[in-house]
Amino acid sequence: MKVKIKCWNGVATWLWVANDENCGICRMAFNGCCPDCKVPGDDCPLVWGQCSHCFHMHCILKWLHAQQVQQHCPMCRQEWKFKE
């Protein structure tokens, strides 16, 4: 017996792999997007600090811009440095 496939519709899904489920700044889910973005994905990436905390890129950039003197992680207050 042979089976012939006449039509095939592929479906894919993606998820960010992060320590938490929600951004510590905006409290939105990582599999969604930050309040500044309309659609989740590459335009709203996640970024990690050397302290291992993770945030939406736009959220942490706003947070760091608001810090006048020293830029600290909003979760642990260590000096913020992006993980490479």
UniProtKB/Swiss-Prot annotation:
The keyword Zinc applies. Gene3D superfamilies: Zinc/RING finger domain, C3HC4 (zinc finger). GO terms for molecular function: cullin family protein binding; G protein-coupled receptor binding; ubiquitin protein ligase activity; ubiquitin-ubiquitin ligase activity; zinc ion binding. Changing C76S: Greatly reduces autoubiquitination activity; in isoform 1. A zinc finger (RING-type) spans 34-77. One of its GO terms (biological process) is protein K11-linked ubiquitination. Zn(2+) 3 binds at C34, C37, C44, H58. Keywords: Cell cycle, Cell division, Cytoplasm, Metal-binding, Mitosis, Nucleus, Ubl conjugation, Ubl conjugation pathway, Zinc, Zinc-finger. Expressed at high levels in skeletal muscle and heart; in moderate levels in brain, kidney, and liver; and at low levels in colon, thymus, spleen, small intestine, placenta, lung and peripheral blood leukocyte. Zn(2+) 2 binds at C51, H53, C73, C76. GO terms for cellular component: anaphase-promoting complex; cytosol; nucleolus; nucleoplasm; nucleus. Its main location: cytoplasm. PROSITE patterns: ZF_RING_2. It is found in: Cytoplasm; Nucleus. Zn(2+) 1 binds at C23, C26, H56, C59. Pfam families: zf-ANAPC11. Auto-ubiquitinated. The RING-type zinc finger domain coordinates an additional third zinc ion. Belongs to the RING-box family. This is Anaphase-promoting complex subunit 11. It comes from Homo sapiens. The gene is ANAPC11.
